[in-house]
Amino acid sequence: MTSSRPIAHNTKNKQTKTLKGRDYAVFLQKLGYTFKQPDLLREALTHRSLGFPNNERFEFLGDSVLNCAVSTLLFKRFPSLPEGDLTRLRANFVNQQALHRLASALGIGELILLGEGERKSGGHHRPSILANAVEAIIGAIYLESGFAVVEQVIVALYEPLIRQLDPDTSGKDSKTLLQEYLQSRKIALPEYSVLLAQGDPHAQVFHVECVIPGFGIRTRGEGTSRRRAEQEAARQAYELAIVRH
């Protein structure tokens, strides 16, 4: 999906700041995307205090695109999480606080286009304005290049955050991650117990339960050894602990 629509500009309420210079170049590098139609980005960075057109419609679109992309990312990355936990985890990644942090990392505050009153009142630091701008930029990328491209941009931006929750890419095994997480919150360590060992001695499958009384979490893992089964149970427990607590 691409867009080549003309963008009208309100000449009555012009903002003298232009999208160029070092801040702009650094922003594009961090974003990992260069607009073929710079006016799309300008509108995505234009707050309603500057007049019309502004970024509210782009924000509306970007909100839906972001939710879809993050939902897909979490669905693929955490195959054992149930729907409710995926929903809570997604909310942690797309809420205003998370988007504000992302906007700050991208340097959007230096580029946002504001009306005089909003600018004087510190609007370029306001979390809601910056969070909305992130969604608007995502909407603009979607309009210009379609979902496949904007999804790649979103995944690249969120990958460092997702990696922190993913035992497979953290460099530590699941039991260690779970133990460290619980210790940091002064929660009693998990209890592991073998529920069942099936099969011949040379080809057994172990079923292990992991219980965290302090969090009310109970998970089960299986593997060809007790250790592997414990690791699988710990992985599931860690994911649940991160999402719920």
Swiss-Prot record:
Its EC number is 3.1.26.3. Mg(2+) binds at residues 59, 132, 135. Residues 24-146 form the RNase III domain. GO terms for biological process: mRNA processing; regulation of gene expression; rRNA processing; tRNA processing. The active site is at residues 63, 135. Keywords: Cytoplasm, Endonuclease, Hydrolase, Magnesium, Metal-binding, mRNA processing, Nuclease, RNA-binding, rRNA processing, rRNA-binding, tRNA processing. Pfam families: dsrm, Ribonucleas_3_3. It is found in: Cytoplasm. It is an enzyme of class 3 (hydrolase). It catalyses: Endonucleolytic cleavage to 5'-phosphomonoester. Its cofactor is Mg(2+). CDD domains: DSRM_RNAse_III_family, RIBOc. Residues 173-243 form the DRBM domain. One of its GO terms (molecular function) is ribonuclease III activity. Homodimer. Belongs to the ribonuclease III family. HAMAP family: RNase_III (MF_00104). This is Ribonuclease 3. The gene is rnc.
